[in-house]
From Swiss-Prot:
It comes from Echis multisquamatus. Expressed by the venom gland. It is found in: Secreted. Keywords: Disulfide bond, Glycoprotein, Hemostasis impairing toxin, Platelet aggregation inhibiting toxin, Secreted, Signal, Toxin. Residues 34-147 form the C-type lectin domain. This is Snaclec EMS16 subunit beta. Belongs to the snaclec family. EMS16 is a potent and selective inhibitor of alpha-2/beta-1 (ITGA2/ITGB1) integrin and acts as a potent antagonist of platelet aggregation and cell migration. Binds specifically to the I domain of the alpha-2 subunit, in a metal ion-independent fashion. Its main location: secreted. Pfam families: Lectin_C. Heterodimer of subunits A and B; disulfide-linked.
Amino acid sequence: MGRLISVRFSLLVVFLSLSGIGAGLCCPLGWSSFDQHCYKVFEPVKNWTEAEEICMQQHKGSRLASIHGSEEEAFVSKLASKALKFTSMWIGLNNPWKDCKWEWSDNARFDYKAWKRRPYCTVMVVKPDRIFWFTRGCEKSVSFVCKFLTDPAV
């Protein structure tokens, strides 16, 4: 009997792994997983600093999202399209000293960009036919997206 239960459980684990259903199990309810990170789009509009503070309160290691490639950008844009009426949102890229030295709020490497124009804090805009980034004064209020690394031990 114990062996039958073990076999059934093993088959369930294999099924969930292959179906992708288990992929989101490391993220809290309401968050979505992509490439070992959890993401959540927040609709209430906040300025960049307030948005970053809210992200940091959500989960250990959570910050405004850093984007490192077109696949990640497409994933975040799908989340935004589902969650927001107006698909403009803060991401973690900023120029805090206004010296053209851009950095991610989570200290990730600045290795991908999709600029529309320049300086200060960065908004990602999702349109039906394109995705682009542009800079905006950090005091402006828009929606935002948070991100954190999942715990592989969970």
